[in-house]
Amino acid sequence: MSNLSMRAIGLLVLTLMACLDICPAHAEMNDFPDRLDNFGFSLLERLEVSETKNFLISPASIEFALGMAWTGAAGETAQAMGRLLGINSSSREAALSELTDLRATLESPGSGITLKVANAAWIDDSVQLNKSFSTDLAATFKTKLESVRFRDSNTISRINDWVSDATGGKITRLLENPPVPPMFLANAIYFHASWNTPFQKQSTQPQPFYPASGANLTVQMMQQKGLFPYAKGRGYQVVALPYVDNRFAMYCFLPDHGVNALVEALKKTSWSDLS
C-alpha cells in the first residue's frame, strides 16, 4: 500500500479489469480466469498501439463474441479457436460450462454496481442454423437470435438500436453498412459503479499533462490523497482505484517511456503479479 497523490507526468493508460471469482464445477477449469487474463494480454500485444490516439478494448467482450463463433465450429477450426481463447478442455460440455460461469459471474456484480452482459446473433434469412448451435448460443450466452434480411437497409437500424440499448446509449451507431452474410455476432458489456473512495468535485483542477509527443497540455484532472494498492514494475508504475464493494477496480498505468514500451513491459507480466 502507498500514500499516493498521482499527477500526470507522462502518458496515462487506463485499464478496467474485472476481478472475477469464478468457481467452475470442473476441476480442470480452475485456471480459466488466468487463461482469460492471458488472452487479454496476448490481444494487447497484437494491437497497433498509437502514441497519439486513445483506444479502448474489452478482452471479455471479444472472448464472448469469439466464444459464440467457437460454439458453432468443429474439427481443426474449433481446436485452433479453443487454443486462442484458452479453452483447452477435451470436453465440449465442460468448456461451455466455464463460459456460462463467466457470464453468470459478470451478471452478479454485487451491491451498488451495474454490470450488464448482452449477446446477439443476426442470421441472414437465407441460412438455417443448426439446432444444437442455436441451443448452445441461447443456453451458454443468452444470445438473442434474430433472422433478418441482410440486404435490407432496416437491418442496420435494428442492429444499431440493439447496440444502443445494450450500452445504455453510450454507443449509438456501430454499423454504417449492412453486415456481411451469413451471420453477425455482437457482444456488449455495460459497467457503471461509484468509487469506493469518491473523488470530490471541488478537487478537480487544471493540471499539466504530458503526452508522448512531448507537448505540455493543461487538462481538468481529478485528484485525491489516500491509501491505494500501488506497485512499480519494470518501465511503469500502477495504482488500483477500487469501486464500491472492492470487487472491481480501475488500474491506472503510468509508463516511464510511452505506451509502446508499456505494452512491451506488460508482455512479461502476468495479471496475478499486479492483482
What are these regions (language model features)?
Residues 18-20, 30, 207, 246, ...:
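Short non-domain terminal segments
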Residues 79-81, 199, 228, 264:
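Short amphipathic alpha-helical leader/targeting segments
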Residues 92-258:
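Non-catalytic, conformational "gating/processing" segments within enzyme and secreted inhibitor domains
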